Each structure stands twice: as structure tokens, then as C-alpha cells.
Amino acid sequence: MAEERHHTEHIPQWKKDEIENIKELIQSHKVFGMVGIEGILATKMQKIRRDLKDVAVLKVSRNTLTERALNQLGETIPGMKEYLDKQTALIFTNESPFKLYKLLEQTKTPSPIRGGAIAPADITVQKGPTSFPPGPILGELQSAGIPASIDAGKVAVKETKVVCKAGEVVPQKLATMLSKLEIYPLIVGLDLRAAYDDGTIYEPELLAVDESKYFSDIIRAAQNAFNLSVNTAFPTSATISTLLAKASSEAKNLGVNAVILEPGVMDTLLAKAHVQMTSVASEAADKDANAVDDDLREVLGAAASAAAAAAAAAPAEEEVKKEEEPEEEEEDHAEEDGMAGLGALFG
């Protein structure tokens, strides 16, 4: 203990200030994360700082100073030291870890690879024309292992080819040609290793949420719950109106089919009886014109006229429907816009 205190007393003041600053940032923000910054140029780092300045604080410090700050905080931030490795930056925010992960993923952009670097994945050059006219570039591509030729007055890649496999060292010639072809094998940006929030450490695998699938699952679950509530007659604030409408409809159908003389079904029963009566009368009149009296014959005539008028009006209604179709499309777009608005709630 005395040895540790003696060592601490000989730490330069600027290091002590840096340690205190790290501790203060951890304690004053809801979420604290560690990010990898390997391969990020200074200019890109400055742009990332500007882009994040309204939602997060990005700090680059020595790993030894960060470790000392975490040691001094003790059990306040347990488990985060194991993510402190190589080139590391600290990030502090009051947003959720999920929102932080999404923001950091947006900082990643394709970047050219340098000669001598290790290919992170298979590097493939696709078959097709390039923007280069015939010239020395043809020989340079071929010497880099890219199958090139002249086609229609332009340099073209003759076939799709994997020019460097994952894990292999990228030759300098190939790196130069890839940049000229605007093939950027690297994805460079802040790489979140872990985020700490209220005693829980979140790793990227947990934070990488497919928002569209998650949103669809929520909608499907809500629909299934609604259907279950209606089909099992389980009343809730969301389904009570549907259940009452369903019960009313079923009660009315029962009253009509069982011929129960109640005020709510009398009109339907009378209308049904009238239709049945006119149907029987029509068949009787077809067989014998004298089978129906004048009053009934007049009713049958009115029904026939109404049927003819309805048949004549059908084409006109079809034309009106065609004219209304654009409006329906506009309504569909409005519904889609509404769904897009809901999607915005997920960040």
C-alpha cells in the first residue's frame, strides 16, 4: 500500500488531472463506452467528434491512465477494464446503449486499404468496364494481378476475380490499383467494444438490433393479442368496442334466424318476409296471371322496375369507382406515411 502511494505521489500533475477528468466524465454521464479507433485518420476523427458533439463526448487517452481511473473508481464500474486494448477511445453519453451503438455504426465508411495491411475479407474485383482509356494503366492492372484488357475503347476487367483472400497481406501494387478502381475494402469508424449502463455491460452482439424486424414483431404481437382477446371474448380497453359490435351482430342474427319478435329485429324480419312474399307471388304470377290481385301485381311491377334500374346503374357505378381509384392510392400513401412516422419512434 505504501509502495502504491509512493508511486502515485510521483505521477506528473497533468496525468493526475487526466485521470480525474476521466473519472468525472464517467460519473457525470449515464452511459460510458469503450471504442476501437484503429486505422482512423486524424481528419476523420475530427469529423466524428463534430458529428457526435451534441449527443456524446469522445475522449482519447492513454490506456494506462484510463485503467488507473477505473481502478480508483473500484466497483463503481466493474468489468470494463477487459475491453481496454490497443488503440482505445472513451465515449460518454446520456443516450441509451442501443442509440449509442446505432450512432457509432453510422460513423463507419468504406476506406482504401494500404499496402502491407491484412485483408479483413476476400477482396473481389468485378468484371466490367472501367473509366480509364487505353494506356499504362492496363499494364499496371495486369501486374497487380487484375485481369484487364481493352474493350470498346476503354480498359475493362475481363472476369470477376478474388485478388486477395481474407488474412493475406495486400501487396502495394494491388492496394494502389484498388484505390484507382475506387474499391475500398476497409470499413473504418468507431468500433464499440462495450457500453456500461447502470451496472450492466452491453456488447455489440446484443446492441445490433434489426429495427425493421423488431418493429414488425411488435405489430404482429399486438395483432395476435387483439385477435386472441376478441376470439376468447376477453374484454380490454382496446377490444371492448369490437366485442360489443360482434355481440350485437350475433344477437341480431340469432333474432332473425329464430324469428324472435323484438324491436331490434322487427324491421329485418318484416323486410325478409316481404322479400319471401314477393318471390312466392312472382312465381305464382308466372304460372297464372290471375293468381295475384291488383295490389300485389303493382308491388311486383315496382320490384321489377327497381331491379331494371339497378342493372342500368351498374356500369355508371363501375366508372365512378375507376375515377376514385387514385384517391384510394393517395389514402394508401397516407397510411404508409403514418407507418413511417411510427418507425421514427424507434430512433
Swiss-Prot record:
Residues 312-347 are annotated as: Disordered. Residues 325-338 have a biased composition (Acidic residues). Keywords: Ribonucleoprotein, Ribosomal protein, RNA-binding, rRNA-binding. GO terms for biological process: cytoplasmic translation. One of its GO terms (molecular function) is large ribosomal subunit rRNA binding. GO terms for cellular component: cytosolic large ribosomal subunit. Pfam families: Ribosomal_L10 (PF00466), RL10P_insert (PF17777). Gene3D superfamilies: 3.30.70.1730, 3.90.105.20, 6.10.140.760. Signal peptide: none annotated. InterPro entries: Ribosomal_protein_uL10, Ribosomal_uL10, Ribosomal_uL10-like_insert, Ribosomal_uL10-like_insert_sf, Ribosomal_uL10-like_sf, Ribosomal_uL10_arc. Part of the 50S ribosomal subunit. Forms part of the ribosomal stalk which helps the ribosome interact with GTP-bound translation factors. Forms a heptameric L10(L12)2(L12)2(L12)2 complex, where L10 forms an elongated spine to which the L12 dimers bind in a sequential fashion. NCBIfam families: PRK04019.1-5. Belongs to the universal ribosomal protein uL10 family. Forms part of the ribosomal stalk, playing a central role in the interaction of the ribosome with GTP-bound translation factors. This is Large ribosomal subunit protein uL10. It comes from Methanosarcina acetivorans (strain ATCC 35395 / DSM 2834 / JCM 12185 / C2A). The gene is rpl10.
